[in-house]
Swiss-Prot record:
Main location: cytoplasm
One GO cellular component, as annotated: cytoplasm
A family per Pfam: NTP_transf_3
Enzyme Commission designation: 2.7.7.77
Cofactor field: Mg(2+)
Organism: Bacillus anthracis
Residues annotated as binding GTP: L9, A10, G11, K21, D69, D100
Protein name: Probable molybdenum cofactor guanylyltransferase
Length: 200
C-alpha cells in the first residue's frame, strides 16, 4: 500500500463551460495532461475519475488509469469520485485535484502532503478566506464516512468535512500561491486564465 496517491476528478458535466473542461487546451496540451504532469512529478500512483462521455478521449491522452465512478454512486458528484479513487488505489492519504485548476504547481502537493499526520482525517487549504476541499488531502479512513453520506443521498463536501477532524491550512502560512487554486468554470474565466498566463 502506498503512503500517498492522487485522485483527479474529471467526472463533472462542465455545463457552465460548454464542453468538457478536462480536454480544454492549455500550454500546448490539455488541462488534464497538464494537471497529471504536475501530480505525477510528486505522486507515484494517480488515477483519473472520468465521465463516461469522455473516458476514451482522456485515456488516449494520459499514461495513468482512467476509471468511472463506482456504478451504484455514478453521478453523485465529487464524493463519488473520491471514494471510487480510494477503492481503486490503496493508500494512507489521497491528494485530490479537480480537472479545472490548471495553474496548480507540484510545489502544492509537496506542501499539502507535508501537512498530513495521523491525528487528522483531512488537510484542507484556506485560500483568500475560502476553503478548498477539492485541492485537499484525505486519509483513507474517511472512505467509510463518504459511503455513509452517499447512502443518505448526501453529496456535499461540506457535509464530509463536518464529520472529519480537519487540519485547515492557511495558504499564506505555507507560502502557497493563490494563483495555484484558480479554477475555471466559464469560458470568460478560461480566457482570463490564458491572459494571466501569457502576462507572466
Amino acid at each position: 500500500m502506498s503512503k500517498y496517491a492522487g485522485i483527479v476528478l474529471a467526472g463533472g458535466m462542465s455545463s457552465r463551460f460548454g464542453e468538457p473542461k478536462a480536454l480544454a487546451s492549455w500550454q500546448g496540451s490539455t488541462f488534464i495532461e497538464h494537471i497529471l504532469k504536475v501530480m505525477t512529478s510528486t505522486l507515484q500512483e494517480v488515477v483519473v475519475i472520468s465521465h463516461s462521455d469522455i473516458k476514451e478521449r482522456v485515456e488516449k491522452l494520459v499514461q495513468v488509469p482512467v476509471i468511472e465512478d463506482i456504478p451504484h454512486y455514478k453521478g453523485n458528484g465529487p464524493l463519488a469520485g473520491i471514494v471510487s479513487g480510494m477503492e481503486y488505489i490503496e493508500a494512507d492519504w489521497y491528494a485530490i485535484m479537480p480537472c479545472d485548476a490548471p495553474n496548480v504547481s507540484h510545489e502544492w502537493f509537496t506542501i499539502l502532503l507535508e501537512q498530513t499526520s495521523n491525528e487528522y482525517d483531512a488537510v484542507v487549504p484556506i485560500i483568500n478566506g475560502r476553503k478548498q476541499p477539492l485541492l485537499a488531502a484525505y486519509h483513507n479512513r474517511v472512505k467509510e464516512k463518504i459511503y455513509a453520506l452517499l447512502q443518505d443521498e448526501k453529496r456535499s463536501m461540506g457535509q464530509l468535512l463536518s464529520q472529519c477532524n480537519v487540519k485547515y491550512v492557511s495558504g499564506e502560512d505555507v507560502q502557497a500561491n493563490a494563483d495555484w487554486f484558480i479554477n475555471v468554470n466559464t469560458k470568460e474565466e478560461y480566457v482570463q486564465a490564458q491572459k494571466d498566463l501569457s502576462n507572466k
